[in-house]
Amino acid sequence: ENRQIPLIKNIIQASDLKVQTGGGVRSVEDVEKLLHEGASRAVIGSLAVKDQDTTQTIFKKFGAECICLATDVLPQNGEYMIAVSGWQEGSAVTINDLIEGYLDVGLKHILCTDISRDGTLGGPNIDLYKTVKNDFADIQIQASGGVSSLDDLKVLNTDGIIIGKALYEDLFTVEQALEAAAC
């Protein structure tokens, strides 16, 4: 099991930025390692669906400020269904069910990806983020999937935005993105 902890540590040490990291987080010990190396927040995805007891233990041990739930969704029949295991498996859990399951342990942060739009440059799923924000006004939402333009950043009413392919394709710069998102 290669968790890339040394690489994550190097990234954290090379920057004054807060670093949120995840991928393959499956235990209390995994979260402990990430936070010990200086990550400000650990992202938990599949574990939150597959093992709610362990995930709640993580929230209680480290505090909600240090945990972000990855809510990777696929729109299906008017619902946003959670996908797990690197998007390889569907689940019977809706995004609302997942969020509601962690409110009692203080859930504050979600990274919400519409996986049908991720990497497509097809624009973000504005309705998804509006719905989640309306249903859970106190949750900090990081939007992910489909960002293709600076206009996308201006219309997303979320607390953070994940940008991938648009930067790789040089559609705009990080500086331009920060300026657009600040509007």
Predicted regions mapped to residue ranges:
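Short, small-residue-enriched loops and turns at beta-alpha junctions
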Residues: 1, 77, 90, 117-122, ...
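Charged helix-capping and loop-helix junction motifs
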Residues: 2-9, 88-96, 122-130
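Generic hydrophobic, aliphatic-rich segments that mediate packing or membrane embedding
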Residues: 4-7, 11, 30, 51
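Surface-exposed amphipathic alpha-helices with a cationic face
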Residues: 8-13, 35, 56-63, 103, ...
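Catalytic cores of alpha/beta
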Residues: 15, 19-20, 25-41, 127-161
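Glycine-rich phosphate-binding active-site loops on the catalytic face of alpha/beta enzymes
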Residues: 33-54, 114-117, 145-149, 158-177
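Conserved anion-binding
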Residues: 35, 39-117
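Distinct, well-ordered alpha-helical segments
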Residues: 55-58, 125, 153
